[in-house]
UniProtKB/Swiss-Prot annotation:
Region listing for Disordered, in residue ranges: 94-145
Protein name in UniProt: Small ribosomal subunit protein bS6
Primary role: Binds together with bS18 to 16S ribosomal RNA.
SUPFAM superfamilies recorded: Ribosomal protein S6 (SSF54995)
Organism: Sinorhizobium medicae (strain WSM419)
InterPro entries named among the record's database cross-references: Ribosomal_bS6, Ribosomal_bS6_sf, Ribosomal_S6_plastid/chlpt, Transl_elong_EF1B/ribsomal_bS6
Keyword DNA-binding (UniProt): no
Superkingdom: Bacteria
Length: 145
């Protein structure tokens, strides 16, 4: 049997319990077709980069699958039909990763010192004083003329 990583996005307006129900439903489909589901990670409700079917957020779920190709095709067919699934992607892998995925690893960006990897202008130093801003002449607004 082949190894796969399968990620799907569910609509934002379903509950986490319904997302778990979807996971159990697709687990059952894979097991009924002779496969096994290993790790299941629920990444939670995350913002989308762009709107998908009028949704700005989605529930993300990762599943590690060890199953024959027909089982994966059946899961994808059922996801295509289900209106709660916005997108899905299945990738064949050589082996499953051990431990949490990259999305589940906590990466704290603020624990780095100030000069490390913050951008191309890190060496600028402090900003100069701009002075009193009320001394600048103001343009009259056109609607007050």
């Amino acid at each position: 049997m082949a190894l796969y990583e399968h990620v799907f996005l569910a609509r934002q307006d379903i509950t986490p319990q319904q997302v778990d129900g979807l996971v159990e439903q697709y687990k059952g489909v894979i097991e009924a077709n002779g496969g096994k589901v290993g790790r299941v990670e629920n990444w939670g409700l995350k913002s989308l980069t762009y709107r998908i079917k009028k949704n700005r957020k989605a529930h993300y779920v990762l599943m590690d699958i060890d199953a024959p190709a027909p089982a994966v095709h059946e899961v994808e067919r059922q996801m295509r039909i289900n209106e709660d699934i916005l997108r899905y992607m299945t990738i064949a892998v050589d082996k499953h990763e051990e431990g949490p995925s990259a999305m589940m690893q906590k990466r704290d960006r603020d624990d780095r010192p100030r000069g490390e990897g913050r951008g191309p202008r890190d060496d600028r130093g402090p900003r100069p004083d701009r002075g009193d801003r009320d001394d600048r002449p103001r343009r009259p607004r056109e609607d007050r003329a």
